[in-house]
Amino acid sequence: MNRFGTRLVGATATSSPPPKARSNENLDKIDMSLDDIIKLNRKEGKKQNFPRLNRRLLQQSGAQQFRMRVRWGIQQNSGFGKTSLNRRGRVMPGKRRPNGVITGLAARKTTGIRKGISPMNRPPLSDKNIEQYFPVLKRKANLLRQNEGQRKPVAVLKRPSQLSRKNNIPANFTRSGNKLNHQKDTRQATFLFRRGLKVQAQLNTEQLLDDVVAKRTRQWRTSTTNGGILTVSIDNPGAVQCPVTQKPRLTRTAVPSFLTKREQSDVKKVPKGVPLQFDINSVGKQTGMTLNERFGILKEQRATLTYNKGGSRFVTVG
């Protein structure tokens, strides 16, 4: 019993620190400032929470050390720009980004430029050194050259510089150059005419006449029906063709129709109305009869006429 009791007393004595040491620590903390006390408490807390690493842990492989660090929440090599270890313990290359992460278009621009050379000392761009500084531009230039070599030459209509505009005309949609130029001239004329400038149209009447003749002449046509009728059109050069009259271009605005004076016709138009069979003025002058009395007499005469004829379909209501 005594041995067992002595053992217990020894165990308790070794496990708990002496009270004198604790009192000394408390006295030291009283003399210290508040910031120093906070720092000291943090250090003590870190020492208590930090796991004790044995030699066995140091002899473990990289994967086992990685698992232990994940379990205990230890971050090793957490400094900026240091080489970090992956799961198998191999060194991973770290990127130094002191000014923050550069993404997007700025990252593309900076990757092509050589580091360490200021733009003042950099030689001017040429075909030789463009690949060193801007490899992306070099690739684009090569692709453009390949595409230009593969393209076929397309016939381009020559037009005056003033009227040259971008027209999205498909390749298979062919039109005569004369028509295009004529349309351009008319557009230009209307543009200037709206701003009060006089325009003299220069039209090739002979060319327009040739175009009209070419439209009228048709080639041989065979009907698609089952009948045996053949339609043929033959040119007759002896026939007189009516010359195409060109309307002169107006240099002033046309007068609207409602402002023009209408020509007064000599023939008087008979007004539409009901024939009264007598002159109202003469009746009023000759007799003292009113219009109501006169119309009443006419109604009675009409009623007697219809009654004498016999039966009629119409009935007059007085």
Swiss-Prot record:
GO biological process, one term: mRNA export from nucleus
Function: Required for mRNA export from the nucleus to the cytoplasm. Acts as an adapter that uses the DDX39B/UAP56-NFX1 pathway to ensure efficient mRNA export and delivering to the nuclear pore. Associates with spliced and unspliced mRNAs simultaneously with ALYREF/THOC4.
N-acetylmethionine, modified sites: M1
GO CC annotation terms, alphabetical: cytosol; nuclear speck; nucleolus; nucleoplasm
Record-listed cross-link Glycyl lysine isopeptide (Lys-Gly) (interchain with G-Cter in SUMO1), residues: K140
Annotated source species: Homo sapiens
TM segment ranges: none
Compartments where found: Nucleus, Nucleoplasm; Nucleus speckle
Subunit structure: Interacts with CHTOP. Interacts with DDX39B/UAP56 and NXF1; interaction with DDX39B/UAP56 and NXF1 are mutually exclusive. Interacts with SSRP1; required for its recruitment to mRNAs.
Motif UAP56-binding motif per record, residues: 26-44
Family in the record: Belongs to the UIF family.
Protein's UniProt name: UAP56-interacting factor
